[in-house]
């Protein structure tokens, strides 16, 4: 078992985090933590896509990380490669007031740790993101693209106040110019978006000498069934090869622990149950009532 999953009940909000080891905590530790309780963006493959409670405070964000290290008796100073990713529940850039001070504190507490902001690209002031990334040189930036056309992406990510694919390219290049670090785009590889034409569109949008690609095997929303099946892994691997041929550096996001208690964002049973038990706190998001995309068969 290389993954541990945690739920935090803040009384007025619920959050979740995941802790990974590859293969030991001393060699590589990865933490995925929440920045919001629920999510207003409503991605149709995400278990948190139906409801939004509130943004988390900086203390609540930092507290998740501190608890995970303490719970497994991990000494961050002895970890060869440590990564803290803001990519569990919530859209980080819709909580810059909580995220920015949390990043500064985490950088002071764990100066060796890489800090990754994973965003669906809402329309916010990206100059603030660039400035924060220059100030804290451990910050990385990843845009959740997931499709090669805006039409298909809009069906997957119904939140309207977001950047287009072309606008993401512009902001990513500006971030690269400001920081000297390569941004990532993440892409959910499924049966309908892994053609050569998809790879060509991505290459035309995102310059391979600037961008790196993260290909995800998890494109389903499901509380009880393993999502990262072998077919998904094969699709991801084949599409990574297509992108490699076009000059991209690629990596695979294959989160361990996609098991019968639900491993993806917002899928842990306690989170789902908490949302159902607190209808006055868990407000309907833009995705509520829309069809689920890529449901497992």
Please state what every model-predicted region is.
Residues 27-31, 47-191, 212-214:
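Core AdoMet radical
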């Amino acid at each position: 078992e290389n993954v541990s999953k945690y739920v935090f009940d803040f009384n007025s909000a619920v959050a979740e985090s995941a802790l990974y080891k590859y293969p030991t905590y001393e060699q590589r530790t990865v933490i995925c933590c929440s920045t919001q309780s629920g999510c207003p963006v409503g991605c149709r493959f995400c278990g948190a896509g139906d409801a939004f409670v509130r943004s988390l405070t900086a203390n609540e964000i930092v507290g998740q990380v501190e608890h995970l290290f303490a719970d497994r008796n991990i000494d961050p100073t002895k970890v060869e490669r440590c990564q803290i990713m803001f990519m569990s529940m919530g859209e980080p850039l819709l909580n810059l007031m909580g995220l920015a001070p949390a990043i500064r504190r985490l950088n002071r507490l764990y100066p060796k740790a890489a800090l990754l902001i994973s965003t669906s690209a809402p329309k916010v002031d990206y100059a603030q993101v660039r400035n924060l990334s220059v100030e804290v040189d451990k910050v990385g930036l990843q845009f959740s693209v997931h499709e090669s056309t805006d039409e298909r992406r809009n069906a997957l990510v119904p939140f309207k106040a977001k950047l287009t694919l072309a606008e993401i390219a512009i902001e990513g290049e500006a971030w690269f110019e400001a920081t000297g670090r390569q941004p990532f785009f993440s892409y959910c590889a499924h049966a309908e978006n892994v053609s050569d034409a998809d790879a060509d569109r991505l290459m035309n949008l995102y310059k391979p000498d600037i961008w790196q690609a993260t290909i995800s095997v998890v494109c389903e929303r499901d509380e009880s069934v393993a999502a990262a099946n072998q077919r998904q892994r094969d699709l991801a691997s084949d599409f990574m090869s297509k992108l490699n041929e076009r000059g991209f550096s690629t990596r695979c996001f294959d989160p361990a622990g996609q098991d019968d208690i639900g491993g993806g964002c917002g899928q842990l049973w306690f989170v789902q149950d908490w949302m159902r038990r607190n209808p006055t706190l868990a407000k309907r998001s833009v995705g509520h009532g829309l069809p689920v995309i890529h449901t497992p068969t």
